[in-house]
């Protein structure tokens, strides 16, 4: 395809040496104001531990805000993330910001949780990058995209209404599907899609308010709700291809997966399906009643912080007995 320039943010410790790089895949956003290059991402809290954070904007945000974001198109988004890492690291090292250790952490929550696993797959499956992964931290991720979308239709309810059009459009545009979106969305949602979603002016909660309903059948047409229709079967095919759990791959580097049983946006079954698919991999699961999707994100950040502190102690031989 044609080359495209992407943007992102690097957060460096104020002083002292850099321990390692943390490559962050960002969570679901809707407005360009929320893009990592435009705000201080919550993951940035980890910089105080001495890590440098590399946080790419996905295609459709930052300098490419005029593009439609191919939401949950895994390989493409993972490539965005990895490309920024490959571009930024030589620049940082030349500027005197080389880390003490040459292995890296991958991290992401929500959309970023699935994306960070896709980044791990990209690095491990195509071994010519010569990137050593120390550990991967994934939280609240839609590892099975079809199952996540299916829940919206099955229950006729979504706690994040904006996810329905963003996911549908991302799959159709990102996979170049021959599907007419106007047949799948409600007339009012389709009529407002460019203003509400593609203008990148509104946050997820603002779009939810504009949509004004949590009932899936208010957002989709009868064709969009019919899982036997040609349009939906094409959509499901694309969602299956973009689900990291359908890859014939098992994570090699150690992984930490966290998911709240009470997640109201990304169903908990994503974690149980991951556990079933990736049996035998070096994965630590932290599954429990951590509240809804957003509340669990805060817990995820602080849990990762604790894990990083503990890993440092082990590395330095300072064990707490």
Language-model region placement:
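N-terminal cap/lid segment of alpha/beta-hydrolase-fold proteins
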Residues: 1-20
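Accessory cap/linker subdomain of secreted extracellular hydrolases
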Residues: 139-248
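C-terminal catalytic histidine-bearing segment of alpha/beta-hydrolase fold enzymes
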Residues: 231, 235-242, 265, 269-321
């Amino acid at each position: 395809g044609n080359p495209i320039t992407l943007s992102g943010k690097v957060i460096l410790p104020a002083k002292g040496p850099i321990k390692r790089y943390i490559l962050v895949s960002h969570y679901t956003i809707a407005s360009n104001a929320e893009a990592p290059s435009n705000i201080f991402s919550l993951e940035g809290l980890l910089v105080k531990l001495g890590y440098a954070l590399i946080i790419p904007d996905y295609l459709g945000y930052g300098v490419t805000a005029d593009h439609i974001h191919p939401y949950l198109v895994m390989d493409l988004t993972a490539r965005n993330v990895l490309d920024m890492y490959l571009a930024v690291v030589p620049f940082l090292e030349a500027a005197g910001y080389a880390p003490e250790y040459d292995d890296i952490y991958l991290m992401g929550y929500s959309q970023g949780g699935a994306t960070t696993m896709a980044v791990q797959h990209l690095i491990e499956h195509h071994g010519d990058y010569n990137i050593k992964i120390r550990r991967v931290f994934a939280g609240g991720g839609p590892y099975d995209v079809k199952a996540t979308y299916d829940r919206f239709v099955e229950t006729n309810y979504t706690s994040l209404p904006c996810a329905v059009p963003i996911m549908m459009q991302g799959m159709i545009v990102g996979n170049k599907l021959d599907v007419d979106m106007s047949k799948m969305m409600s007339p009012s949602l389709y009529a407002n899609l460019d203003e509400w979603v593609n203008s990148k002016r509104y946050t997820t909660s603002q779009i939810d308010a504009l949509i004004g309903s949590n009932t899936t059948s208010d957002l989709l047409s009868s064709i969009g709700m019919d899982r036997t229709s040609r349009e939906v079967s094409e959509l499901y095919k694309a969602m299956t291809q973009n689900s990291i759990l359908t890859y014939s791959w098992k994570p090699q580097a150690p992984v930490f997966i966290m998911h709240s049983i009470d997640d109201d946006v990304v169903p908990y079954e994503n974690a149980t399906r991951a556990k079933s698919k990736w049996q035998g991999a070096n994965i630590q699961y932290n599954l429990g009643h951590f509240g809804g999707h957003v509340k669990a994100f805060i817990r995820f950040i602080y849990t990762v912080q604790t894990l990083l502190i503990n890993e440092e102690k082990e590395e330095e031989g300072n064990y707490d007995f």
